[in-house]
A protein has these predicted regions:
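Solvent-exposed, charged amphipathic helical/linker segments at domain boundaries
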Residues: 1-66, 70-72
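Low-complexity, glycine/alanine/valine/leucine- and proline-rich hydrophobic stretches
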Residues: 57-131
């Protein structure tokens, strides 16, 4: 199983838990509350990025969010930063490795999301490819 570096304060842990819950529940309103106004989103290896809460939310609403229950998130850490591994439900109802979210936490919420669209990274975190 993956490891997670516990944040030093409960507020940061709550922020991470709420981020994961927003994706798992396809809850755009909840995610809106968590993102700083100047949040940045990158999705390597795709050469696309977004800056600003509205732009990030429009993108996620159009292409990333699915139905509640179709995503499962597992907290982990990467390079000393909080991260979450994202699993997505396939047509066969199996949850498969999808991407790894590296999160930069700011003073008022999530300041940056770098989402690596590479399921092969899961093994580096000790995570299975399916759940």
């Amino acid at each position: 199983m993956g490891w997670f570096m516990e944040p030093e304060d409960a507020g940061r842990r709550e922020l991470l838990d709420r981020y994961c819950a927003a994706f798992e529940n396809a809850d755009m309103a909840a995610l809106t509350e968590l993102l700083q106004a100047d949040v940045k989103l990158e999705r390597p290896p795709v050469p696309v990025w977004f800056t600003g809460r509205d732009a990030v939310l429009r993108f996620l609403a159009a292409l990333a969010f699915t139905r509640a229950g179709d995503i499962a998130m597992v907290l982990t850490a990467a390079n000393g930063q909080p991260a979450a591994a994202e699993y997505r439900r396939g047509e066969d109802d199996v949850m498969r490795a999808h991407s790894v979210h590296i999160l930069t936490l700011g003073a008022t919420g999530i300041a940056a999301m770098t989402v690596f669209l590479d399921p092969s990274l899961f093994s580096s975190f000790g995570l299975p490819s399916t759940r």
